[in-house]
Amino acid sequence: MPQASKAFKPDGSGNWWIDEEQFAADFAADIPPEKAWFMAISQVPISTDSFTHKVTKPAWKTKPTWYMVAAADRSINPNQERMMAKRARAKTIEVNASHVAYISHPQEAAKLIEEAATFEAASTAQVNA
């Protein structure tokens, strides 16, 4: 699967953007074009620091984790997503979706979030009992 790295462009001030013309194909291929275009023109840049900052205490090492693999993602290779989910021992689901899987598959995303929230609520109740 080709990566979308050529669509990510630096702006010279330490931020990166996804090229508006390539946004739909590389980032949001499975949603209606008008929604992808709106996302492209309203995107918030990502800081270079996001790619280089070292995380010293990742939460996934000590907390339960859930992950939705986007099997048609062109921004993060789906095999990399699967590896990250496995490493985190995450409860994992997989959808045939682009990087914006939470938009193209809202029911699946909501169900996974509800499962995580229910698990956390039950865990908290046991601790407080």
Regions found by a protein language model. Give the residues of each.
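Helix-loop "lid/cap" segments that line or gate small-molecule binding pockets
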Residues: E21-D30
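Catalytic active-site module of serine/aspartate enzymes centered on a nucleophile-bearing elbow/loop
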Residues: A90-A129
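C-terminal and late-domain segments of enzyme folds
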Residues: R74-S75, E81-A90
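Conserved strand-to-loop "acid loop" that flanks and positions the catalytic carboxylate
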Residues: P64-D73
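Flexible "cap/lid" loop of the alpha/beta hydrolase fold
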Residues: M1-E20, S47-S50, I76, M84, ...
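Alpha-helical elements of Rossmann-like donor-binding domains used by nucleotide-donor carbohydrate transfer enzymes
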Residues: Q22, F38, Q80-M83, E108, ...
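Short, proline-enriched alpha-helix->beta-strand connector loops that line the catalytic pocket
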Residues: W60-T65, R87-K91
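Active-site nucleophile elbow and catalytic-triad environment of alpha/beta-hydrolase enzymes
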Residues: I41-A59
